[in-house]
Amino acid sequence: VSAEAYEAVFGAGGARHPETGERLVSSRRPGMELVISAHKSVAELGVIGRAEDMHLIMDAERDATVAYLETVTRNGGGRRGRAAVPTATSGLVYADTRHATSRAGDPCPHDHVLVANVVEMLAETGGWKAATTALWREHLHAATQIGRAATAHRAVQLGYGIAADAGPLGRLGHWRIAGIGDEILELHSKRAAEITAAVEARGTDT
């Protein structure tokens, strides 16, 4: 995506056509950002020389997450008329970029998927409208779980053992690469440690 096209779609005031400059929608909200982050054990694959596998696993999560939201958006991501009738659209307009580390410099590969607040209506009258962003929020947890299931499947296909990971509070609902110890993950979790320390300094916990 060129800088010009990005500015046209995500710029202030609402999306413009990246080629003609025509205003497609008027909106104060340019879109929504999805951050799709690999489990720390997947990040460690890049550290031990298996970056290709790491990226294949991450691709599976990103693709499955976006595909789910794409289907939801195609089926009824637009609203038509005062009754806000759910309307079929041509799907998502989005840009994706992958970062390799956390702000603290730890291995923390993650995707930023920027979904534009604009959809092409497939009703008889056609045209472009602002997206029904509430629909995306309603389906975000489902999209996350589908993405995680896809990565688990891909990891097994690549020959890795996996194990459930409920996280420290028991609600994470994730999985991890088996055989990569907690001590390794903690070594490369400086950002998480900084956040925990800041929260504890306020007299609360995470």
PLM features: residue spans?
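Intrinsically disordered, flexible peripheral segments
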Residues: 1-206
